């Protein structure tokens, strides 16, 4: 998923440079149709019964679990912050006349994301999530600030690498903690909650930041995103203080 969020915008940015917007929409349609076709051949596992033999609840309320909600909220704020990058990088780069640098931003993001994910999972499993989460939140914050105040191609590429390290490395840890916070028969609910939080953060973040662009400009939406990352870190710290040490599902399994 992380690479898809990079490859798609990278292709879109390069098509935008040639004003191939119609072709871009047709490409998105083709990929969506391919996804639907592939989903038809996926085998869905049967509903797992609880230990007492009862079936899990289905419906809207089954999408939430109180134990997992705090970590989902942190994930929401993280993705909300990243929405400004995903939705407005091309427009921001065009305003700065840095369209080529925007493509390189995404390449740097992908490269550093793949490099860091090779070892951050092991660090989380051996030492604990805080040794990954707090440094990554700091790096993500710096990356957003660097992007907001960029004045050239080099700074934009550096910000891409920093955001790849920060946002790209910390999201699997949050997924691990959401799953680890619930009972085994609720792992599916927790996993669904994680992705719902990401989708909501991306959609609501793009909508709200889109309304902010005209009054404050693109630079300030990235500064606002950095503030939200700090808020997410504070919420995470409070939650970890309440829970203390908690056993984790192996993070490497989620990478």
Q: Where are the model-predicted features located?
A:
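Small-residue (Gly/Pro/Ala) motifs that create kinks and tight helix-helix packing interfaces
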Residues: 4-16, 90, 204-213
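Juxtamembrane intracellular "pre-TM" segments in multi-pass secondary transporters
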Residues: 44-75, 254-255
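Helix-to-loop junctions at the C-terminal end of transmembrane segments
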Residues: 16, 116-128, 213-214
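A membrane-interface helix-boundary motif in multi-pass transporters
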Residues: 16-30, 211-228
